[in-house]
């Protein structure tokens, strides 16, 4: 299924690109989230009329993400959790807990936190990536201490 991208999508393309994707991905994710429209002649024509507006909106979102990234750059956040004698946590610290800790200073969504190794299960210092925009990723330090 061919779609016209209205926003930059990782591994697909940028604004205005025509991409071939599976129908389920288009119907269930791209189109409902307003990241793409079906690639018809009418939609291609209307997109060309709106291209400047969409590119300006994308640049505005990226600038806002870069401003948020500057406030997060080099920051250290601390989370206290119940832990055993050897530093193993009772439970784990996931994206929601990290987003709540960071949100005390900068508004961050749970979906923007990247934990490639999964939830944190030990005390210590961890580097956590926060993806504020598809092109803006900032790394913060997370200190997990025993309560």
UniProtKB/Swiss-Prot annotation:
Domain of life, source organism: Bacteria
Keyword Ribosomal protein part of the UniProt annotation: yes
Spans through the membrane: none
InterPro entries per UniProt: Ribosomal_bL9, Ribosomal_bL9/RNase_H1_N, Ribosomal_bL9_bac/chp, Ribosomal_bL9_C, Ribosomal_bL9_C_sf, Ribosomal_bL9_N, Ribosomal_bL9_N_sf
Signal peptide residues on this chain, from the entry's feature table: none
Record GO terms (molecular function): rRNA binding; structural constituent of ribosome
Pfam families: Ribosomal_L9_C (PF03948), Ribosomal_L9_N (PF01281)
GO cellular component, one term: ribosome
Keywords, comma-separated and alphabetical: Ribonucleoprotein, Ribosomal protein, RNA-binding, rRNA-binding
The UniProt record lists the keyword Mitochondrion: no
One GO-annotated biological process of the protein: translation
Protein function: Binds to the 23S rRNA.
Family: Belongs to the bacterial ribosomal protein bL9 family.
Protein name: Large ribosomal subunit protein bL9
Organism, as annotated: Marinomonas sp. (strain MWYL1)
Organism phylogeny: Bacteria, Pseudomonadati, Pseudomonadota, Gammaproteobacteria, Oceanospirillales
